[in-house]
From Swiss-Prot:
The UniProt record lists the keyword 4Fe-4S: no
Binding site for NAD(+): V13, G15, V16, T99, G352
TM region(s), chain numbering: none
Subunit record text: Homodimer.
Molecular function terms, GO-annotated: homoserine dehydrogenase activity; metal ion binding; NADP binding
Origin organism lineage: Eukaryota, Fungi, Dikarya, Ascomycota, Pezizomycotina
Organism encoding this protein: Paracoccidioides brasiliensis (strain Pb18)
Protein name according to UniProt: Homoserine dehydrogenase
Similarity remark: Belongs to the homoserine dehydrogenase family.
Length: 372
């Protein structure tokens, strides 16, 4: 990659954002980082020259007062301010949004309308209203701006790009099925393993949830994982790419694993304290599957031909690919006309800052190649 300078803005320097900046610092011919924003601060290279660029390897110091001579420091900028700044750069601009902020996601059509390409793991933009989805891609097409969002499903796994390639080359997608949540994968692989480990006693559901929380696999409030909405958003994205006009993640059945009596609790601590009272419910579900020689897993499923999308518990044979998952891995199966009875399967780590950032960085490289 060589030629014209491309100017880069980055929003979000948390888990994924920090890993992305580390990876960016190692890229040969990296774009010129001219905007870096977090919730309370924005740092920019001075206009109109848009130089000096911010060093991604030393991004923390850009927020310090000692660097104020080199950069322009401000409070939090709204999307209009960010779009105005990047659109006036002396070359093509790219915005990397490493947040899950719906306000930023809603502004994607604005950025694209100003010729700013977008790379992001932000699921909100692509799984909220279908109107926003259409607006994003219609605006991109009319302005020659680019949109890449590999890491919205499966972190760094090539899920989105593979499905887009299948569709673009004319394959007919019949069904998509998989374990889309690293958290729920870990919970069920631990709670109901396909093969019992010798010397390891079976754990109660509440114990497995507590262990996952301690290991950092769950959100601070595990209900944000157990309600199934994260999986529903990912399934919405894939269903839309496959050609279904899914209106929102609330427009199809999503099975919540939160006991009805615990849904209204105000604190995560109280939820964790009372969860053991409902262990018998999950035990019964596990035992029912075992009585039929099967295991239970939490999956997302898109029946493209039948136009049916659903998320929830499902039983699988113990020798199935889904039953063989380990740890917090994801697995996504694409059933298509070309691949016949044996689906195209993508499997691997579906969560984690470094692998999610890898998907973002790889998308950025693709955008840079196309813009150059």
């Amino acid at each position: 990659m060589s030629g014209k300078t491309i100017y880069l803005g980055v929003i979000g320097v948390g888990g994924v954002g920090a890993h992305f900046l580390t990876q960016l610092s190692r890229l040969p011919n990296a774009p010129s980082l001219v905007l870096l924003a977090r919730s309370s601060q924005t740092v920019t290279s001075p206009a109109p020259s848009y130089s000096p660029a911010i060093a991604p390897s030393d991004w923390q110091s850009a927020f310090s007062t000692s660097s104020s001579a080199s950069y322009t420091q401000s409070g939090a900028w709204n999307p209009d301010q960010i779009a105005a700044y990047l659109s006036k750069a002396p070359g093509r601009a790219v915005l990397v949004d490493n947040t899950s902020d719906p306000t930023v996601a809603d502004a994607y059509p604005l950025f694209l309308s100003k010729g700013i390409s977008i790379v992001t793991p932000n699921k909100k933009a692509f799984s909220s209203s279908f109107n926003l989805w259409k607006n994003i891609f219609n605006t991109a097409a009319s302005t020659s701006s680019l949109v890449y969002h590999e890491s919205t499903v499966g972190a760094g796994l090539p899920v989105v790009s593979t499905l887009r390639d299948l569709v673009a080359t004319g394959d007919r997608i019949t069904r998509i099925e998989g374990v889309f949540s690293g958290t729920l994968s870990f919970l069920f692989n631990s709670f109901a393993p396909a093969t019992a480990q010798s010397g390891v006693s079976a754990q109660k559901w509440s114990q497995v949830v507590a262990q996952a929380k301690d290991l950092g696999y769950t959100e601070p409030d595990p209900r944000d994982d157990l309600n199934g909405m994260d999986v529903a958003r990912k399934v919405t994205i894939l269903a839309r790419i496959a050609g279904l006009e899914v209106q929102s993640p609330e427009s199809f059945p999503v099975e919540s694993l939160i006991p009805a009596k615990l849904r209204g609790l105000t604190s995560a601590a109280e939820f964790m304290q009372r969860l053991p009272d409902f262990d018998d419910q999950m035990e019964a579900i596990k035992n029912q599957a075992e009585a039929e020689g099967k295991i239970v897993r939490y999956v997302g499923r898109v029946d493209v031909e039948g136009k049916v999308v659903k998320v929830g518990l499902q039983q699988f044979d113990k020798d199935s690919a889904i039953a063989g998952l380990k740890g917090s891995d994801n697995i996504i199966s694409f059933y298509t006309e070309r691949y016949g009875k044996n689906p195209l399967i993508i499997q691997g780590a579906g969560a984690g800052g470094a692998v999610t950032a890898m998907g973002v960085t790889a998308d950025l490289i693709k955008v840079l190649e196309r813009l150059h």
